[in-house]
């Protein structure tokens, strides 16, 4: 849920094979419910994500099943009973450090932190350790709907799109490729997914001090 909400990702990757939805279960339920937050969209691939609406969808899914939620709480450590068996997890929030025990632990960290810290085997990146580059997601509000309707979009596919004059311009040395797509999230709100940055999301030093562009 983090990428579609706090991560500001602007669209779902395709859920269909071109004819029908192929992801079922919880995935389809989340997708179908989240589409209600973008009622202006009438297609099923690359559907915009209304992050604020998606938060409610996720909250409703877990609370309707009786789950007690703690916002702004992060897993801090794993305590092992023995090799391969988790005894407890330690979480951190404004109340400090707290320990929780359960019969079953489900890793929802996104990066597999619980499994990795518990000693599970894992692989990061390619043979050299390089990982897929991240993109920069952001939103713009108070966009004039009339002016935007005249433009349509600023996607890279448009030969007259602004990214083509930005890329290679010495004024913007951090822009190292032409990746740019935008989605109309709601009235006067555009969501963007643009550019790439060389960063390892599992390394705090990496995403705090981004390397210089190639």
Where are these regions (language model features)?
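A conserved hydrophobic secondary-structure block that centers on an alpha-helix together
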Residues: 81-85, 92-97
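Long, well-ordered, tryptophan-enriched scaffold segments
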Residues: 135-189
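Conserved small/polar residues in nucleotide/adenosyl-binding loops
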Residues: 208-213
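Core beta-strand elements of the Rossmann-like FAD/NAD(P) dinucleotide-binding domain
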Residues: 96-104
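N-terminal leader/propeptide and maturation segments of large enzyme subunits in energy/redox metabolism
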Residues: 192-195, 200-204
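Glycine-rich loop(s) and the adjacent beta-strand/alpha-helix scaffold that form part
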Residues: 107-151
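Conserved N-terminal/central alpha/beta ligand/cofactor-binding core
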Residues: 2-81, 132-133, 186
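Solvent-exposed loop/turn segments at secondary-structure junctions
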Residues: 76, 96, 112-113, 145, ...
């Amino acid at each position: 849920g983090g990428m579609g909400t706090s991560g500001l990702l602007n669209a779902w990757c395709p859920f269909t094979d071109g004819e029908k939805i192929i992801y079922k279960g919880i995935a389809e339920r989340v997708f179908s419910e989240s589409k209600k937050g973008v009622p202006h969209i009438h297609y099923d691939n690359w559907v915009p994500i209304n992050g604020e609406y998606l938060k409610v969808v996720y909250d409703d899914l877990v609370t309707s099943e009786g789950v007690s939620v703690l916002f702004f709480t992060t897993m801090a450590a794993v305590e092992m009973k023995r090799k391969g068996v988790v005894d407890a997890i330690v979480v951190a929030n404004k109340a400090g450090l707290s320990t929780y025990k359960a019969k079953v632990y489900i890793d929802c960290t996104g990066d597999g932190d619980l499994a990795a810290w518990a000693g599970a085997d894992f692989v990061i990146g390619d043979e050299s350790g390089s990982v897929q580059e991240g993109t920069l997601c952001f939103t713009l509000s108070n966009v004039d709907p009339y002016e935007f309707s005249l433009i349509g979009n600023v996607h890279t596919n448009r030969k007259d799109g602004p990214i083509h004059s930005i890329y290679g311009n010495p004024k913007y040395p951090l822009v190292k490729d032409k990746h740019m797509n935008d989605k109309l999230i709601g009235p006067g709100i555009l969501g963007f997914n643009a550019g790439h940055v060389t960063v390892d999301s599992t390394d705090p030093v990496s995403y705090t001090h981004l390397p210089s562009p190639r």
